[in-house]
Amino acid sequence: MNTSPDRVIIFDTTLRDGEQSPGAALNVDEKLTIARALARLGVDVIEAGFPHASPGDFDAVQKIAASVGSEADSPIICGLARTTQKDIKSAADALRPAAKPRIHTFLATSDIHLQYKLKKTRQEVLEIVPEMVAYAKSFVDDVEFSPEDAGRSDPDFLYQVLERAIAAGATTVNIPDTVGYTTPSEFGALIRGIKENVPNIDQAIISVHGHDDLGLAVANFLEAVKNGARQLECTINGIGERAGNASLEELVMALHVRRSYFNPFLGRPAESTEPLTKINTKEIYRTSRLVSNLTGMIVQPNKAIVGANAFAHESGIHQDGVLKHKLTYEIMDAESIGLTHNQIVLGKLSGRNAFRSRLQELGFELSETELNNAFIQFKEMADRKKEITDRDLEAIVNDEIDTVPDHFRLELVQVSCGNSARPTATVTIRTPDGSELSDAAIGTGPVDALCKAIDRVVKIPNELISFSVREVTEGIDALGEVTIRLRYEGRTYSAHAADTDIIVASARAYVSALNRLHVALQQKEKTPEMLQV
């Protein structure tokens, strides 16, 4: 195995660490959709989940291994496991369909974790790590070990742990900055120290994993690459626990745009034009939008690379410069991440074949049933909007691939409000037993009345903690996308919907979020003793 490749391995953990963002819970079908997108994007490794955490996670990892990772040229499919036999065996079982399975096992090494969380001594850790790495190695050839909270661990102890993990068969050793505490110079020095002080480090690839609590994750990773790290663990849009993880799109485009700077650190001539990663950068924007839509986590407008303002220029001086030559104020082409500027693409006279063709050009793969349903939505929208743009089509398709089971289905919504009238909403909802129930409510505003009317029918307790509206397209007939977040027993459930009528979009988003909560409650009844990770 080449443990010092002249390229950077991209390890995506959107489906594992990214899903730990509050409100980002995904069902199995949604995870499969994202996994397929990650494969198209060209990531080397997909961390599909934590198989022993719950039956749902096990099922997701197994299905991703079978449908996305079963071919010789598929990405490596990885499952997370603590350093216990039960965890590792669950990961091995879930990964069995994968052509290239990897078990990723971890144990904390910082004194604060040993004392307060694990209640273990350093000597116990030195004994557990090689034993469990060897156990994982008995199932798969590819084993990754992570010393959790490595950034706050004693370096000399860390070197000993890594040496034993590699001797036991670890092919990748991952260095996590678990709480986002280190600075770039410190993190670079940590990686350099590992290169210089772990005797058998040439037998493993050095990986890094980091959180963005101080906004330094990407900078830390780039410094790590300069000092010998060759695998970067990251997520789409930087989603993850607390302030999130290192952002895949920012890392990849930094290596892409500043290739001549990073080339020498990977043993290449500075002028080499060979890509530093296997990522198809033209898939970045579409993958970002997909993850945002399925998780319900909106990308802030000023987000680097994929934010709505990333290629926008307000200043007259900047606009003038860009019109004369893009490079005056843009360091990369928007098309390099797959962001096109197509406007009018279809209208109400467009047929099904034209609709299908445009979706294929945009990279969407729909089944016949999904295509038929999406085309019906397109025709309905075309009756209300004169011009249909790619963003409109994207909203239609994202609604169609929103795979939350339709236990409660919105059949009718009607709202009455005004400056001298009490907002009143009437809804009709088809319930899981097939009956249609109608009810009405008044509220402080139209959305409040709407949610109260829906609650009177659905009767699922919850707390609405976030309601937001943003425009999908421009103009007076623009689509409005509503994102709603509910909380129940400490967990958050998100959903979104788009429509030219934001009241209708609000109703659809609220019902969709309630459906997610309903599914979670059903699963909880079936598996009452879920493992908390």
From Swiss-Prot:
**GO biological process annotation, one example:** L-leucine biosynthetic process
One MF term in the entry's GO annotations: manganese ion binding
Q: Name one Pfam family in it.
A: LeuA_dimer
**The organism sits in which domain of life?**
Bacteria
Primary residence? cytoplasm
Q: So what does this one do?
A: Catalyzes the condensation of the acetyl group of acetyl-CoA with 3-methyl-2-oxobutanoate (2-ketoisovalerate) to form 3-carboxy-3-hydroxy-4-methylpentanoate (2-isopropylmalate).
The protein in question is named: 2-isopropylmalate synthase
Species of origin reads Microcystis aeruginosa (strain NIES-843 / IAM M-2473)
